[in-house]
Every structure is written in C-alpha cells, then in structure tokens.
Amino acid sequence: IGHFSIVEDNTVIGSGCTLESHVIIKSGTTLGDDNRVFDGAILGGLPQHVHIPEQPGRVMIGYGNTIRENVTIHRALVTEHATIIGDNCLLMVGSHVAHDCHVGNHVIVTNNALLAGHVHVDDRAYISGAAGIHQFCRVGTLAMVGGQAHLVQDVPPYVTVDGLSSLVVGLNKIGLRRAGHDQATIHDLMAAYRIIYRSGLRWAEVLEQLRTRFPTGPAALFYEFLSTTARGIVSERRTPPGATIKLRDTVVAEPQQPQVRVKFG
C-alpha cells in the first residue's frame, strides 16, 4: 500500500494486490487477488444519483486487473446489488465506471472513457478513448468502440463502431483473429452480419434467420444478443453507391505563366 493511500472499513483486499500512492478504497469495495491500482484511483465512491440510498450496494472487482491513474468506480444504488468488474481488465487513466455497471473479463476501457449507470460490457470488448456509453446500454463480446463515440443503443458482439459517426462500420476482424477465431468462424459471423445490416428484412425475420441458420457457435450469440436488446442496436454507416475516398484534391490547377522580370534603363 503506497504513500497517502486510504483503505476504509468494510473492504476486502485480496492477496498480491498493489495500491500505489494516493489511492482511496472506500467502504463497500471488494478487490480480488493480484490487482494493481495506480495513483489517485478512487474505488467504491457513492453513486452519482439524485437519490443516494443510505446503504448503497458494493463494488466487486475480480482478479488480475490493472486500474490506472484517477479511475473512478462507484457503488451500486441498491444494497443487494453490486457494480462488477471481472478478471484481467485494463481500465486506463481517467476512465469512469458508474453505479450498477457490469464489466466482463479481459475488457479494455481506455483513457477518459465513461460508462454510465447500468451499462453492461461483455468479455473482451474494447472501449476507446473519450467514448461515452449511455445508461442501460450493452456492449457485446469482442466489440470495438472507437474514440469519442457517443452511444445510446446497444453494440452487437464482434462489430466495430466508428468514433466519428458513432455507427457500425463492420466486423472487428483484427480482434476476432487475436482472440483465436479461424477464418471459417469469421465467415459465419460475416454472413450473420449481412443478415442483420444488409438483408433489408424486417426485425422479426432477421431474428428468425439468425436463429435457424446459426444455432451453435460464435455466430449464435448474435441471436441471443439481439433477441434480448431493450434499446435497439447501433445502425450501420452506409456509404452512398459509387462513392470513393478522396485521396487528394482532384482539381488540376492551371499552369502559371513564368514571371518575366524586365529591367528598364
């Protein structure tokens, strides 16, 4: 436990944990084994809510997590509930996890990203810098959210959300390969993706297609996720037909006449 750190009563800190300087572990917080908490982090603060209960819930943090400088994690609103961080997560500088959030395993939340109350982030998701996730939204497994994205709907598993438009731009193929998924699995995921975003089917038909064509395997998670969404899902960013990326200005400047200096006298 580093210099000037504070550990309040009613806390549990597992073996092998490291608290750097100026860390505050507030009442109602449980840390599993082998967590490292960097300078200035505050874990277990009261929920930011207009009606703070006298006995809020807990913060439950698993094992092997890295919690960087000035991260804040707040307790749940209801006594029997908890804000949960799984195992082997990385919460980077200044990120915030609000009350009643559930963060899975191997999740990365980068600098200054904000998870509002009741947000669920599934395993191996990646939240880029300064992204903001609205209350009660869910981010699916192996989804990647781009920097400065602002999300008010659920992000399906395996997809990438562009930070500028806050819209889906395709599968997170790099993340899928890093997670060990082979090309056949990625092919199935791409087929399911096209059903969701490019088939033109009605919502009930999309769900039926996913249920019947992909009953097992990673692609089956699309049906499970979409059939339980309460907020709807993030739309796809569509490029107009025939559009291309302008690599440089195509306007050709008219050749300039050479300047002739005339000497008088």
What are these regions, as identified by a protein language model?
Residues 1-167:
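Structural signal for interior beta-strand "rungs" in well-ordered beta-sheet cores
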Residues 34, 40, 51, 64, ...:
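Terminal amphipathic alpha-helical/low-complexity segments used for targeting or macromolecular assembly
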